[in-house]
Amino acid sequence: MPIVQQGAINTTALIVPDLYVQIVPPQVLLLNGVPTDIIGMVGTASWGPVGEPTIVGNMSDYAANFGPVMPRKYDMGTQVATAVQQGAGNFVCVRVTDGTDTAASLTVLGGVTFTAIYTGSLGNQLSIIFSAGSAASTWRVTIAMPGQTPEVFNNIAGTGAAFWSNLADAVNNGNGPLRGQSQLVVATDLSADTNPIAGIFSFTSGTPGSDGVGTITAASLVGVDTLPRLGMYALRAQGCSLGLLADADDPTQWSTQTAFGLSESIYMILTGPAGDNIANAITVKAEAGVDSYAAKLMFGDWIYWSDQVNAI
């Protein structure tokens, strides 16, 4: 009974009946790790897509996608900022509104209407700058907003209605291999027979945008589980390990959050009201039926936090 290493003999050439043992060396197995540091955040914001999970790594990412921290209840930025200061750096953020959010818009010289690509009050800080283009008899149009890289559309030619048509086409589709479509606004050509003039046109003189937060509740943050999913349910299949609904202190929504955590293997962080006491917290928790490894109910007064963005 020969014992050999695997591959040392040609088994197809063996002609003598016998028992042959081959030693098979151990194989190297590659194990892919599963991240456990992804935090799902749901709350309100002044800019950005609604109901669309967006990856954020730090506060610069957050500001670029959702605008600044806002000093109000249910604000998503406040939750992200406090988590970042404690070392977190991997978020999936979902913006919610009450359905009344609107996008800022501005009509320039009767020739074109610019509308912010997202709803929210941050769009009110947009500005459009007209100046001479690099080529003769052309115009350069710059779209700027605080916290965003200015978008420059150069060498837009034409006069009268032709210019406004060319401008709208450049903004909506790009005007070169290095200048794609705008990520801040969309343009609507009004076919006006007017010519552009140099200057700065601010959205503060147009139709203001709104955040849609006037009637937000904890139920709004929970959202709906039908397509397109909104609120908490937009975190499905996003790989989150932790989940937090900003300031969702309504105990009638805790069991729903817990059930979602169980279904998605997410550890849900539940929020109690500010200024709560032990006796009330125990009673409310029992009435809500929260008793699961998939949820943690935070007790205690809400923290005092130095908001350096709003200086409060």
Residue ranges and their predicted role:
Residues 1-312:
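A glycine- and small-residue-enriched flexible loop/hinge signal that marks low-structured segments
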